Amino acid sequence: MNPGIDLQGSFIELLTNVGLPPGVAKAVWMPLPMLLMLVGATIGVLISVWLERKISAAAQQRIGPEYIGPLGVLAPVADGLKLLFKEDIVPANADAALFTLGPILVVIPVFLSYLIVPFGQNLLISDLGIGVFLWISLSSIAPIGLLMAGYASNNKYSLLGGLRAAAQSISYEIPLALAVLAIAMMSNSLSTVDIVNQQSGLGILGWNVWRQPVGLILFWIAALAECERLPFDLPEAEEELVAGYQTEYAGMKFALFYLGSYVNLVLSALMVAILYLGGWDFPIPLNLVASWVGVSETNALFQVIAGAVGITMVLLKAYFFIFLAILLRWTVPRVRIDQLLDLGWKFLLPVGLVNLLLTAGLKLTFPIAFGG
């Protein structure tokens, strides 16, 4: 198997060749992955917001953002700057400490989850053995922040929105975890890199989507509910709750909720690409491509091109699902709260359990095809 590009080793070697001591070179490297993660996730959010505006406009036969930059690409940046300079208001009867802590608790766990998202064999910040388990654990922290924000606002609409967010998250966290467990069972690992490697070698035919079609649908529905996307945006339903738990927020605190929502959507789409669509894997096996071109897989130029193609593949697969999520907003009506909970507990949970048991049975019966 192609070992991929050792980004950390190459960077440290480059700095030591320039004349820096190895210790200093390692110290320079340490903050760079985190900075890259923050910048990359923020750019991903800006692209998603722009896509949402343009696709929504097309669905309604409008033009959408047009004048702020080419094709309106700078409109999300303008929104962020506007919110940055708006007054930060704390309601008179609110609990100021919890009111401030709420949006922080929502955003930080989502950004931390990007630690285990691989864009290539070695193109990730931390290849943890408990990768997907860490992601599910961190995603369960955000609802605490939403509930905290709703309670601290001292507003009935905010409180109802926070309670809805907590109920929704609990209802859909379990089906999501069951779908991930089925993938982990086939891969014999919780590491995101191992999960992608288990799908490599056969190109598109080796991807988990063919072995886990029900799991993919289950995962995506649960992920949309976790991201509070339509038709599951009950915690902030405008017609019912003004803006839900965000009602009393303004300025940067409101922007943090907005940012957290889209960062979570991009993260969920990336996880679909990694768990079910082969991650950075190209639809045609790279060893075949290398033999057709007439170069070795270990060729430095081929590795660089393969790394760039891998990053592109992950992003294309992820943004395809973001496109689907945006289309769903304008094609599916919002469900009622009882329908939302019934779907989670009475349908997705049993389907997830059956899918997990079926995967275990198939793994024992067909160990080669199902990662025995």
Curated annotation (Swiss-Prot):
It is a multi-pass membrane protein. The keyword Mitochondrion does not apply. One of its GO terms (cellular component) is plasma membrane-derived thylakoid membrane. The chain crosses the membrane at residues 27-47, 97-117, 128-148, 166-186, 204-224, 254-274, 308-328, 351-371. One of its GO terms (biological process) is aerobic respiration. Its EC number is 7.1.1.-. InterPro entries: NADH_UbQ_OxRdtase_su1/FPO, NADH_UbQ_OxRdtase_su1_CS. The keyword Chloroplast does not apply. It is found in: Cellular thylakoid membrane. Keywords: Membrane, NAD, NADP, Plastoquinone, Quinone, Thylakoid, Translocase, Transmembrane, Transmembrane helix. It catalyses: a plastoquinone + NADH + (n+1) H(+)(in) = a plastoquinol + NAD(+) + n H(+)(out); a plastoquinone + NADPH + (n+1) H(+)(in) = a plastoquinol + NADP(+) + n H(+)(out). It is an enzyme of class 7 (translocase). One of its GO terms (molecular function) is quinone binding. NCBIfam families: PRK06076.1-2 (NF004741), PRK06076.1-5 (NF004744). HAMAP family: NDH1_NuoH (MF_01350). NDH-1 is composed of at least 11 different subunits. Belongs to the complex I subunit 1 family. NDH-1 shuttles electrons from an unknown electron donor, via FMN and iron-sulfur (Fe-S) centers, to quinones in the respiratory and/or the photosynthetic chain. The immediate electron acceptor for the enzyme in this species is believed to be plastoquinone. Couples the redox reaction to proton translocation, and thus conserves the redox energy in a proton gradient. This is NAD(P)H-quinone oxidoreductase subunit 1. It comes from Cyanothece sp. (strain PCC 7425 / ATCC 29141). The lineage of its organism: Bacteria, Bacillati, Cyanobacteriota, Cyanophyceae, Gomontiellales.
